[in-house]
């Protein structure tokens, strides 16, 4: 016997289905459900008088015989590959399947088995995404990690040793001893972590030493001297050891211009940090490298998106981060050369075109570690407001734009750094690093952050209350953030050479150590939905930016969504 439900009643009970639309936070972005893996009339839901009970939606099957450890029911998945409604089964910390959950003895088409050993997370009316990946971390203080995971980031890649002067300016963990100590410190945090060694050297020996000691990649930074010789040496070592190189190029053009740097790449793949240039790089035209097929370009979030306040705040930030003095004219000139309204405005549009592939933070070194996700979606909102729907979208929904922008902080950073086998998307086989969001708070404050299939952080009310919801409600660490659960649900990323040398055992690391790989044959074409290769031109006098001959310019935003109304308390 069928029971008809109108769309509103159905969505309020089981979440949106095919054809339903959802607004992302208070932005102008609308996503529409493309497919529903669940079965109408046979959905599973937990609660009093609901379906997931013994003999109904819950089978007697043991976990050993196939029941999952955790099921997320009726979630709306937003990922680069699609926007779908589904149940998600998690087993032994990894995504087992995306599909239809239930009891196969009494329900049809069940591919996620619920048993007595299965925990339930209600995903009805919630958006499920992969945990974010921030690939531009200055490890200045450990509190960054708490702030990052509370915002929905589950993987952090970068360098540093704490608030040392070198770390404040550059994302490098230099030398074996420093790498060892940071790898040991990583065991304390419910976060996947990987460290970049210092890549600035004209001879390879010291670089190889760091890679073998555990660096998952190398970082070239102008404050250490990013000369063509250093670039060539670093990339040669990377080719030998299958690791990624990140680069912050020569703002002052002392050792050469952007053309010299591109020539030094010799068509080898490289990750260019803050490719617009305000964070550093050849002035005024480092932005041109986003048109190179071997360059994987990212932004950092202080310039995301271009607003009335962007230029004003940058000068002071830059002076502090790069150990400059406002009383030295040359230092002031150096700082001012990096901050250009024309290239920052163009950066907005290049993201919307898919020519810039990633967004990261530049944590405490001009960027805000807890705002990677937020500023990505603010950029998407601003671009829709100023440029209208993308050609692939319509007046009804913004699915393609949403997929393009979520790829910038999930799958593309994972591919770039050789870790997409483990993280970066909501796909079977990957670590269950997932975020559940209320649509009204999407991109701003996650409801629950899962690390390796266990709740690590969550919105939580007063611990002395009779129920979980009395205020003050804010993000707090949960059981996945304590004791041995940390090592059981997180990863440490190393080079293949370090793994072969058994560095993890030598240092008695508790987290599983896994090797990065598949990096040196990458190109811009591997960047999901963000692989555009425009012909770039920058006027050296006016700083005007053109892509394929078209002037890229836009007005600064005067007001943004996902901002003060969400942070009154």
UniProtKB/Swiss-Prot annotation:
Cofactors: Ni cation
CC annotations in GO: cytoplasm
Residue(s) carrying N6-carboxylysine: 219
Active site (record annotation): 322
Residues engaged in binding Ni(2+) 2: 219, 248, 274
Primary enzyme class: hydrolase
Binding site for substrate: 221
Record pathway: Nitrogen metabolism; urea degradation; CO(2) and NH(3) from urea (urease route): step 1/1
Keyword Disulfide bond on entry: no
Localization (cell): Cytoplasm
Alphabetized GO MF terms: nickel cation binding; urease activity
Reactions mediated catalytically: urea + 2 H2O + H(+) = hydrogencarbonate + 2 NH4(+)
Any Pfam family hit: Urease_alpha
PTM section of the record: Carboxylation allows a single lysine to coordinate two nickel ions.
Domain Urease: 131-569
UniProt xrefs under InterPro entries: Amidohydro-rel, Metal-dep_hydrolase_composite, Metal_Hydrolase, Urease_alpha_N_dom, Urease_alpha_subunit, Urease_AS, Urease_asu, Urease_asu_c
Major localization listed first in the record, in broad terms: cytoplasm
Quaternary data: Heterotrimer of UreA (gamma), UreB (beta) and UreC (alpha) subunits. Three heterotrimers associate to form the active enzyme.
The family this protein is said to belong to: Belongs to the metallo-dependent hydrolases superfamily. Urease alpha subunit family.
Protein name listed in UniProt: Urease subunit alpha
Organism of this sequence: Cyanothece sp. (strain PCC 7425 / ATCC 29141)
Name of the encoding gene: ureC
């Amino acid at each position: 016997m069928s029971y008809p439900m109108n769309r509103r009643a159905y969505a309020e009970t089981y979440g949106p289905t095919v054809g339903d639309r959802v607004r992302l936070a208070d932005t102008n972005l609308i996503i529409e459900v493309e497919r529903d893996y669940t079965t109408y009339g046979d959905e599973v839901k937990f609660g009093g008088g609901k379906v997931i009970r013994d003999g109904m939606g819950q089978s007697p099957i043991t976990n050993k015989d196939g029941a999952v450890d955790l099921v997320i029911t009726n979630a709306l998945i937003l990922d680069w590959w699609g926007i779908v409604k589904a149940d998600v089964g998690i087993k032994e910390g990894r995504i087992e399947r995306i599909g239809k959950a239930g009891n196969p003895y009494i329900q049809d088409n069940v591919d996620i088995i619920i048993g007595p050993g299965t925990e339930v997370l209600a995903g009805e009316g919630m958006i499920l995404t992969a945990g974010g990946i921030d690939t531009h971390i200055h490890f200045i203080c450990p509190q960054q990690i708490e702030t990052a995971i509370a915002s929905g980031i589950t993987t952090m890649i970068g360098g540093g040793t704490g608030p040392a002067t070198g770390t404040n300016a550059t994302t490098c963990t230099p030398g074996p001893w420093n790498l060892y100590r940071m790898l040991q410190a990583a065991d304390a945090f419910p976060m996947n972590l990987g460290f970049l060694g210092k890549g600035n050297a004209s001879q390879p020996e010291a670089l190889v030493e760091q890679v073998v000691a555990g660096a998952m990649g190398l970082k070239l930074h102008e404050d250490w001297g990013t000369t063509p010789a250093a670039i060539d040496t670093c990339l040669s070592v990377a080719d030998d050891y299958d690791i990624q190189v990140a680069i912050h190029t020569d703002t002052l053009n002392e050792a050469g211009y952007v053309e010299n740097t591109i020539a030094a790449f010799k068509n080898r793949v490289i990750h260019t940090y803050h490719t617009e240039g305000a964070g550093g790089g050849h002035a005024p035209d480092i932005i041109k490298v986003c048109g190179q097929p071997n360059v994987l370009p990212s932004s950092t979030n202080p310039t995301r998106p271009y607003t009335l306040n962007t230029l004003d705040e940058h000068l002071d930030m830059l002076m502090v981060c790069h150990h400059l003095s406002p009383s030295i004219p040359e230092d002031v000139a150096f700082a001012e050369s990096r901050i250009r309204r024309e290239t920052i405005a163009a950066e907005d549009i290049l993201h919307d075109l898919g020519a810039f592939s990633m967004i990261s933070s530049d944590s405490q070194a001009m960027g805000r570690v807890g705002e990677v996700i937020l500023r990505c979606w603010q950029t998407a909102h601003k671009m829709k407001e100023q440029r209208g729907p993308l050609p692939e979208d319509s007046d009804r929904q913004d699915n393609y734009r949403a997929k393009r922008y979520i790829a910038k902080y999930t799958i593309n950073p994972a591919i770039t750094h050789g870790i997409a086998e483990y993280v970066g998307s909501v796909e079977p086989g990957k670590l269950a690093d997932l975020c559940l969001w209320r649509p009204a708070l999407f991109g701003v404050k996650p409801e629950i952050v899962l690390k390796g299939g266990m709740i690590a952080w969550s919105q939580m009310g007063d611990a002395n209350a009779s129920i979980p919801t009395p205020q003050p409600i804010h993000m707090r660490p949960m059981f996945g953030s304590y004791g041995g659960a940390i090592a059981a649900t997180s990863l440490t990323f190393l080079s293949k050479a370090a793994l072969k040398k058994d560095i993890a055992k030598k240092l008695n690391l508790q987290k599983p150590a896994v090797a990065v790989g598949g990096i040196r044959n990458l190109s811009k074409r591997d960047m999901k939905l963000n692989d555009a290769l425009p012909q770039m031109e920058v006027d050296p006098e006016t700083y005007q930016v053109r892509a394929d001959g078209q002037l890229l310019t836009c007005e600064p935003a005067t007001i943004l969504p996902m901002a003060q109304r969400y942070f009154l308390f």
